[in-house]
C-alpha cells in the first residue's frame, strides 16, 4: 500500500449495514509512501496515526471525487424514481 498527502484512506464496512469510513491522508510518515499515515477522519474530524489493515484501500482525490459523483447520480436516480412512483 502506497499513498501521498491528499489521498483518501477508505476502511471498508465489514457488513452491508456498516458504512465505509473515509479519512484524508494529511501526512505520510515514510519516504516511500508506505504506512503509517496521519489521517483526518471525515465523520469526526479526529486526527490519528493509522497503520491500515486488509480492509483498507488508498484512493486518489480524483478517484474519490469520481466515486462521490457516481453515488450522487445513483441517489438522484432513486429519488427521481420515488417521486415518479408517487406521481409528483
Swiss-Prot record:
InterPro entries, alphabetized: DUF1918
One of the GO biological process terms: response to hypoxia
Coiled-coil portions: none
Induction: A member of the dormancy regulon. Induced in response to reduced oxygen tension (hypoxia), low levels of nitric oxide (NO) and carbon monoxide (CO). It is hoped that this regulon will give insight into the latent, or dormant phase of infection.
GO cellular component: cytosol; peptidoglycan-based cell wall
Disulfide feature: none
Protein name, UniProt field: Uncharacterized protein Rv0569
Lineage: Bacteria, Bacillati, Actinomycetota, Actinomycetes, Mycobacteriales
Amino acid at each position: 500500500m502506497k499513498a501521498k498527502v491528499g489521498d483518501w484512506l477508505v476502511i471498508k464496512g465489514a457488513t452491508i449495514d456498516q458504512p465505509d469510513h473515509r479519512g484524508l491522508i494529511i501526512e505520510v510518515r515514510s519516504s516511500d509512501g508506505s504506512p503509517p499515515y496521519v489521517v483526518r477522519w471525515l465523520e469526526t474530524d479526529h486526527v490519528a496515526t493509522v497503520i491500515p489493515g486488509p480492509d483498507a484501500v488508498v484512493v486518489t482525490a480524483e478517484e474519490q471525487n469520481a466515486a462521490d459523483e457516481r453515488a450522487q447520480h445513483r441517489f438522484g436516480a432513486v429519488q427521481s424514481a420515488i417521486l415518479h412512483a408517487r406521481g409528483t
